[in-house]
Amino acid sequence: DDIIITTGGSEAVLFAFLSCLNPGDEIIVPEPAYANYMAFAISAGAVIRTVTTTIEEGFSLPKVEKFEELINERTKAILICNPNNPTGYLYTRREMNQIRDMVKKYDLYLFSDEVYREFIYTGSPYISACHLEGIEENVVLIDSVSKRYSECGIRIGALITKNKEVRNAVM
């Protein structure tokens, strides 16, 4: 019941934006990030606000204060790609909990693009946003089989959420 099949991960991102956001709403995204997020946001009338990660810090999640500097009444979501595209950075349990705490504190959506979850080479554990307690209704997970099977022409993706209102809006 929580899974909606889409024509690729890109359509899942667009559906997430269109179903959860209104024109002028803002999404905070750690950068560097997948370039097409911007196009999907524009299509939905939303605005991407970025918080910069640096190579010097290994592209780790910026401090919570950096996110909070950007949060305002128009902020409706945080978008992460885990592992990150293009850096490959894998968020730690501590970082995922920090994201969870911000989502909970400000009642935001967490759009979590997890299409690269099988591409982890460090031995570190992968933490899905769907496993973060206390924000189950806020999480919208994006998935795709294209990367997993090296078949980018196979346009099969999914939008996964426990939030019934979001699922109904998508359908």
Locate predicted features:
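A short helix->loop->beta-strand "cap" motif at the edges of active sites that frequently abuts
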Residues: 25, 46, 105-109, 135-137
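PLP-dependent aminotransferase-like
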Residues: 1, 18-80, 93
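Conserved core segment of the aminotransferase class I/II
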Residues: 132-171
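Aromatic/hydrophobic pocket-lining residues that form π-stacking "cages" and hydrophobic walls in ligand
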Residues: 37, 99, 129
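Short loop-beta-helix segment that forms the pyridoxal 5′-phosphate
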Residues: 1-15
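Active-site phosphate-binding strand-loop segment of PLP-dependent enzymes
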Residues: 54-124
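Hydrophobic residues at beta-strand termini and immediately following loops
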Residues: 6, 51-52, 129, 142
